[in-house]
Amino acid sequence: MRIIYFGTPEFSRIILERISPYLNIIAVVTQPDKPKGRGKRIMCSPVKDFAISKGIPVYQPEKLKGNKEFFEIIRSLNPEALVVASYGKIIPEDILNIPPYGGINVHASVLPKYRGAAPIERAIMNCEKETGVSIMKMERGLDTGPVYAIRKIPILPDDNRGTLSIKLAHLGAELLLEVLPLIKDGKLSPVPQEESLATYAPKLSKEEEIIDWNMRGEKIWCQIRALSPEPGAMTFFRGKILKIFKADFEEKIFNEEIINGTIIEQNKKRGIGVKVNNGILWLLELQPEGKKRMSFLEFMNGYRLNIGERFENS
């Protein structure tokens, strides 16, 4: 099967690396190079990096809709299928209709739950116990197409967005390699999604990065994991931004009235203990404004914390 692969971030690169030895990837389409980091250096996507290393032709159109030149390029390549994994742009119907098997998408959720751009982050932030990948036939709607196959995995307590993304990428690659031959041989038909069960996973807003210390402890813990390894969950300490990348939650009932967000313990083994609605959030990895990431021990030593100090919502 002649395949054009559409993808951009590390999630997509892992899938491409896993499937490329077994499939005929004739070209890769990825997002244009963009400035990144503090120095705003122009960087190419992980997918482009890998494709170049393997000698796979790369295309980086600025736009797809109404791009006649790109349409003709895709048509001239004579693909049998487009395989898409976190490309980052909506692929117009006229392009999806070029190959006989259409567009086949790897989506990092158990559809119809968590349609949209941020299924991994949303699943963790909502404290879900499991998630998975879906292989679906693409159509005009956002992740609304019929589904060929689904595979589930548990979300473990130590999973964050980064670790879960890697697991789901490998799972998606395995599932793709199983279903593509069945699709080609006409042995697997996609099943329509149950619309009444659909939920959506839009990108997280800047406001959702800020910790509300009045939320339940589990929710804050899930928020921190959903925002790690980047951009990090945000709070304010001594008038400056502080990002938190790793924490543990311990359920506990307090007899006395303590304001949520208050430092109640400094434990060299467990972390910085912060009072939350229904327990203690143990902070483990932090990044003060303008500084590098550090362990809780480095933070405790550098900032000489006081019991009773508070992390603020703003």
UniProtKB/Swiss-Prot annotation:
Q: Which residue pairs form cystines in this protein?
A: none
Please give the InterPro entries that the UniProt record associates with this protein: Fmt, Formyl_trans_C, Formyl_transf_N, Formyl_transf_N_sf, Formyl_transferase-like_C_sf, Met-tRNA-FMT_C, Met-tRNA-FMT_N
Xref: CDD domains: FMT_core_Met-tRNA-FMT_N, Met_tRNA_FMT_C
Please give the Pfam families that the UniProt record associates with this protein. Formyl_trans_C, Formyl_trans_N
Q: What class of enzyme is it?
A: transferase
Family membership? Belongs to the Fmt family.
**Main role?**
Attaches a formyl group to the free amino group of methionyl-tRNA(fMet). The formyl group appears to play a dual role in the initiator identity of N-formylmethionyl-tRNA by promoting its recognition by IF2 and preventing the misappropriation of this tRNA by the elongation apparatus.
Q: What is this protein called?
A: Methionyl-tRNA formyltransferase
User: Could you tell me which species this protein originates from?
Assistant: Dictyoglomus turgidum (strain DSM 6724 / Z-1310)
Q: Which gene encodes it?
A: fmt
